[in-house]
Design a protein with these regions (language model features):
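Membrane-anchoring hydrophobic helices of lipid-metabolizing enzymes
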Residues: 2-104, 114-118, 143, 228, ...
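Non-catalytic C-terminal accessory region of glycerolipid acyltransferases
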Residues: 2-42, 165-291
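Short, glycine/polar-rich helix-capping loops at beta-to-alpha or helix-loop-helix junctions
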Residues: 69, 137-142, 221-223
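Short amphipathic alpha-helical segments and helix-helix/interface helices
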Residues: 77, 119-120, 143, 168, ...
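Short, basic, glycine/proline-bearing loop/turn elements
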Residues: 80, 148-155, 183-187
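A conditional alpha-helix N-cap/helix-loop micro-motif detector
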Residues: 85, 157-162, 193-194
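Structural motif corresponding to alpha-helix initiation and N-cap regions
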Residues: 89-92, 139, 161-165
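Catalytic core of membrane glycerolipid acyltransferases/transacylases, capturing the structured
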Residues: 98-158
Length: 291
């Protein structure tokens, strides 16, 4: 295989054209677990070890949060996802019967704003509680809004993990809906499912809560270059009573992964192509495109 000069950035993008002159991007990656294409400069915020997840809020704060979420944010995100991405959600019926019960919802991480906007539409009228990067709460004013919209920053250390785990337990006991992106990093318009770890499945395994997943697929759109999105909801998947917590972590992870892989095959438009790039010494070698 012919060696190529090493590029300064592994997330290099090029505009190319296919046979019918339709432009699309190519993202080169080397690590499916850790490469990120969000194009957002991370502040690498670390939460303090004593970060308080269970802050007590008064009636006025709760009322303000309700109005912001249901009266302002929800209508806006619904219109945005429908108009900009042509988003349709299918198979929401599997959630019927679980509106009053707590559950965990996992999704593939393929959009920037839309990935924050889709879960509220899936689980409505339940309010979303979504795991977010600590950068989201770096500034006090923004932190307050993030909390009102259901954002929960992921713990940054083993010490802060204790409070974080306590928050997950409390949400389960209160029958809340928790949204998690197990792939962790954003790959815009990726039509496959990346391998992900089972760490985030510890919580439904410990609390014996049902698990659902949603898979965003990309469909060809008439008269527009960007594809429309269709979101499929699957589940529920339940922890097995005869399994240990660790065994259920793996079991639930595998259930979600296989369901996502199956749904992802329904994508028929590749707006952004992802190409595996291997390294060999000081040279970067371009591999085959990732299907």
């Amino acid at each position: 295989m012919k060696s190529l000069p090493k590029r300064p950035e592994k997330s290099l993008k090029k505009n190319i054209k296919n046979a019918d002159e339709k432009p699309f991007k190519v993202n080169y990656y080397s690590d499916e677990l850790n490469d990120d294409f969000a194009e957002v400069v991370s502040e690498h915020t670390k939460l303090p070890d004593d970060y308080e997840y269970g802050k007590k809020r008064g009636a006025l704060w709760k009322a303000n949060s309700f109005i912001l979420y249901y009266g302002i944010a929800y209508p806006i995100v619904t219109v945005y996802n429908k108009l900009v991405h042509g988003e349709k959600i299918k198979n929401r019926k599997v959630l019927k019967g679980y509106k009053k019960e707590g559950f965990f919802l996992y999704g593939n991480h393929t959009m920037k704003a839309a990935d924050a906007f889709t879960p509220p539409r899936i689980i409505y009228p339940k309010k979303m509680n979504i795991l977010v990067n600590p950068d989201a709460v770096a500034k006090p004013v923004v932190s307050n809004l993030v909390e009102k919209f259901g954002g929960i920053p992921v713990a940054s250390s083993l010490k802060s993990m204790r409070n974080f785990s306590g928050k997950m337990k409390k949400l389960s006991e209160e029958n809340k809906a928790v949204v998690i992106y197990p792939e962790a990093h954003i790959w815009p318009y990726y039509t496959g499912i990346r391998p992900f770890k089972d760490a985030s499945f510890k919580y439904p395994a410990e609390e014996s809560k049902p698990v659902f997943c949603f898979t965003r697929v990309f469909k060809k759109r008439a008269f527009r270059k960007r594809p429309k999105t269709v979101v499929y909801v699957d589940g529920p998947f339940f922890p097995k009573p005869e399994y240990t917590v660790k065994e259920n972590q793996k079991y639930l992870r595998d259930c979600v992964y296989e369901a996502m892989k199956r749904r992802a095959k329904q994508s028929n438009e590749e707006y952004v192509k992802y190409v595996k790039e291997r390294t060999d010494g000081d040279d970067a070698i371009r591999g085959d495109a990732k299907d």
